[in-house]
């Protein structure tokens, strides 16, 4: 029995609250159960130096956790004077995932920065960040079109992510913290809305997993992501 009584393939309740802050071109509070992340999308004219004159845009991301997002307080990374390796890995993952959702040539010479700040962590903060940031990105791109700065919306489709893993020998979807900390295998999967894989991050924390178990986990992830994408689309229609 899972802690919340969920079935193996069931994701936590997912809530996407749009326009959560007033200044950013796109802002979403995403909730996966007790995990809560504020995702904002900010638009700037111009692109990084390595892209100048190429007629395409860029999407980048930053990720951070509030000091008391976890059980015990973690000092802000700014106070330490540098970002940790985990932070850099996650923000690069978010950026890669969201670049897959956009035609960068159609975006033109704009840079969109996605800021994902974890308010409360209970497992799956990176997958929640990708899911919420995609909706914030969609809102920002819609504003570029509405303001006449783009003729065509460069959004190719939704992107979402979910964690899967093996806990006590059972493959499960969308791990909360107590499950994640006990997992024999932990995996994060990012997919497009039509089920194509953008990224798979998988590690055997204890017992190595088989090829068959890998396929089972990917199938679980696809089912979970289909449910999450439906929630994303419903949020954008409201």
UniProtKB/Swiss-Prot annotation:
Source species taxonomy: Bacteria, Pseudomonadati, Pseudomonadota, Gammaproteobacteria, Enterobacterales
Xref: InterPro entries: ExoRNase_PH_dom1, ExoRNase_PH_dom2, ExoRNase_PH_dom2_sf, PNPase/RNase_PH_dom_sf, Ribosomal_Su5_D2-typ_SF, RNase_PH, RNase_PH_bac-type, RNase_PH_CS
Reaction it catalyzes: tRNA(n+1) + phosphate = tRNA(n) + a ribonucleoside 5'-diphosphate
Family annotation (NCBIfam families): RNasePH
HAMAP family xref list: RNase_PH (MF_00564)
PROSITE patterns cross-referenced by the UniProt entry: RIBONUCLEASE_PH
Enzyme kind, highest EC tier: transferase
Name of this protein: Ribonuclease PH
Annotated positions binding phosphate: 86, 124-126
Function: Phosphorolytic 3'-5' exoribonuclease that plays an important role in tRNA 3'-end maturation. Removes nucleotide residues following the 3'-CCA terminus of tRNAs; can also add nucleotides to the ends of RNA molecules by using nucleoside diphosphates as substrates, but this may not be physiologically important. Probably plays a role in initiation of 16S rRNA degradation (leading to ribosome degradation) during starvation.
UniProt-listed GO biological process terms: rRNA catabolic process; rRNA processing; tRNA processing
UniProt keywords, alphabetically: Nucleotidyltransferase, RNA-binding, rRNA processing, Transferase, tRNA processing, tRNA-binding
EC number(s) recorded for this UniProt protein: 2.7.7.56
């Amino acid at each position: 029995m899972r802690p919340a009584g969920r079935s193996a393939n069931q994701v936590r309740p997912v809530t996407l609250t749009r326009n959560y802050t007033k200044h950013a071109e796109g802002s979403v509070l995403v909730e996966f159960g007790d995990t809560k992340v504020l995702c904002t999308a900010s638009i700037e004219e111009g692109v990084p130096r390595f892209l100048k004159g190429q007629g395409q845009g860029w999407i980048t991301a930053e990720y951070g956790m509030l000091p008391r997002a976890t059980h015990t307080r973690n000092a802000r990374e700014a106070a330490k004077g540098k970002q940790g390796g985990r932070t850099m890995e996650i923000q690069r993952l978010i950026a890669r995932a969201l670049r897959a959702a956009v035609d960068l040539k159609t975006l033109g010479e704009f840079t969109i920065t996605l800021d994902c700040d974890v308010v409360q962590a209970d497992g799956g903060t990176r997958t929640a960040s990708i899911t919420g940031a995609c909706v914030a990105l969609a809102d920002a791109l819609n504003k570029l079109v509405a303001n006449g700065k783009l003729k065509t919306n460069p959004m190719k489709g939704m992107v979402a992510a979910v964690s899967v893993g093996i806990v006590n020998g059972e493959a499960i979807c969308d791990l909360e913290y107590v499950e994640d900390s006990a997992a024999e295998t932990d995996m994060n999967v990012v997919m497009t809305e039509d089920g194509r894989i953008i990224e798979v991050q998988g590690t055997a924390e204890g017992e190595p997993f088989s090829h068959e178990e890998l396929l089972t986990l990917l199938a679980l992830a696809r089912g979970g992501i289909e449910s999450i994408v439906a929630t994303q689309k419903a949020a954008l229609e409201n």
